[in-house]
């Protein structure tokens, strides 16, 4: 979501109904090819001394985002869920993931883009991603764990963003409103509901969690009303964070 996953057709977030989905969901959940994570090291220029820390503290072990696959059994009973191993994203992955359509959308108020896609879940070249895709007659849901190549600290949401509109392209048009995100100790969480004008289309939900300044989780998609999609995806976020926190790489 070292194996390259190519999808010949993107699953429809509206489960085949007429109507436009919001490109955000495709941007993060579908169409991206997810390979091992490389690491980089800073090089000290010749002739200069590396700065010395008063006390050397070992860095905490990075979270193993491949553990996101543990939630494959937490989807509704009639969903078919498939885990996709971790892969490092290149520019072609991001260009092919429909993120460009969302990036070019008009966000009103303009300062509210970070409410819809917090910076820590906005994929960049070098981001490592792993995920689970769950599909069924009653919906499509995507769970993606991300590890950024550089630290991205969560920032407070801007004011005046309780309701947001997206426009500018058929793939990225609709309204966005904040919804309650689950409280997880030591973790920053967000939640939004995304709606399009088509009354036949179910709303989409997007929940995010920042475990630290490099590791994050996104749960997104839509489901039939009888499944209580807001509760369902909120619970999936909690379970996803728990799965990743359960064991760290040595």
What label would you give each PLM region?
Residues 143-144, 214-223:
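Short, well-ordered beta-strand elements
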């Amino acid at each position: 979501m070292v194996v390259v996953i190519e999808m010949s057709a993107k699953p429809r977030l509206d489960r085949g109904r007429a109507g436009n989905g919001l490109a955000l969901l495709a941007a993060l959940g579908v169409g991206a090819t997810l390979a091992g994570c490389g690491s980089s090291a800073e090089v000290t220029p010749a002739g200069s001394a590396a700065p010395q820390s008063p006390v050397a503290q070992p860095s905490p072990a990075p979270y193993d985002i491949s553990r996101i696959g543990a939630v494959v059994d937490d989807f509704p009973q009639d969903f078919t869920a498939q885990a996709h191993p971790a892969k490092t994203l290149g520019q072609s992955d991001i260009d092919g993931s429909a993120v460009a359509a969302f990036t070019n959308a008009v966000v009103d108020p303009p300062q509210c883009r970070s409410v819809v896609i917090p910076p820590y879940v906005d994929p960049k070249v070098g981001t490592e991603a792993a995920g689970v895709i769950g599909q069924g007659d009653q919906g499509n849901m995507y769970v993606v764990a991300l590890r950024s190549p550089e630290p991205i600290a969560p920032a407070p949401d801007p004011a005046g963003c309780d309701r947001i509109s997206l426009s500018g392209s058929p793939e990225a048009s609709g309204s966005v409103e904040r919804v309650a995100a689950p409280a997880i100790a030591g973790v920053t969480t967000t939640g939004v509901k995304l709606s399009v004008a088509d009354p036949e289309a179910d709303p989409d939900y997007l929940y995010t969690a920042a475990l630290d300044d490099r590791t994050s989780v996104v749960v997104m998609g839509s489901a039939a009303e009888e499944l209580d999609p807001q509760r369902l995806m909120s619970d999936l976020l909690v379970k996803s964070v728990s799965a990743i926190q359960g064991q760290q790489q040595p």
